[in-house]
Regions:
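Residue-level detector of beta-strand structural context in well-folded domains
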Residues: 57-58, 104, 131
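Active-site environment of divalent metal-dependent phosphoester hydrolases
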Residues: 1-5, 26-30, 48-53, 75-80, ...
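Active-site neighborhood of phospho(di)ester-bond hydrolases with catalytic His/Asp-centered motifs
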Residues: 18-24, 42-47, 68-71, 94-100, ...
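Charged, elongated alpha-helical/coil segments that serve as electrostatic interaction surfaces
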Residues: 79-102, 135, 140
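Residue-level detection of beta-strand-connecting loop/turn positions
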Residues: 64, 111-112
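Core catalytic region of metal-dependent phosphoesterases/phosphodiesterases
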Residues: 1-62
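Active-site-proximal segments of metal-dependent phosphoesterases and phosphodiesterases across multiple
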Residues: 49-91, 121-124
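Binuclear metal-dependent phosphoesterase catalytic core
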Residues: 4-7, 89-92, 108, 115-147
Length: 147
């Protein structure tokens, strides 16, 4: 179910060069990665990825922007994004991505974009969705897209 939704998203977003998985990928992600060799995958483990070898958070640098990405359960994102933003700033990033709550969020505050795509499999606040973040010379545009 989850990998089918992921394939639909990647087929719809063919121009995407980077793909972020924010945890709870539960094992079927390796098959998806093999199907899209032209994309760069950035993956972190979530609270349901007990045997995962992926880190709980990581950093990517894309087009001059630092992207801190995590599932978020270790940073208490269910209770607010302050610790997430603090960790992203400490890492020199201007974009923070997280999951865990399965509730979408797009926020810009004090030079930091904070984005939660919701979930493509098990949303908690409405429709299944994902996020697209266009990074261009003239700015950053994050949007949530319903499936």
């Amino acid at each position: 179910r989850r990998s089918g939704n992921i394939k639909k998203i990647l087929d719809a977003q063919q121009s995407a060069r980077h793909v972020f998985f924010l945890g709870d990928v539960t094992g079927d992600i390796e098959d998806v990665i093999r199907l899209y060799p032209d994309k760069t995958f950035h993956i972190v483990s979530g609270n349901c990825d007990i045997f995962s070898s992926y880190p709980s958070s990581d950093i990517a640098n894309i087009a001059g922007h630092g992207i801190f990405f995590t599932h978020g359960h270790t940073l208490g994102v269910k209770y607010g994004t302050e610790r997430l933003v603090s960790a992203a700033r400490a890492a020199g990033c201007d974009i923070a991505l997280y999951g865990h709550t399965h509730a979408s969020k797009v926020l810009y505050e004090d030079g930091m974009y904070v984005v939660n795509p919701r979930s493509c499999a098990e949303p908690r606040d409405g429709s299944k969705s994902y996020a697209v973040i266009d990074i261009e010379e003239n700015g950053i545009m994050p949007i949530i897209i319903k499936i």
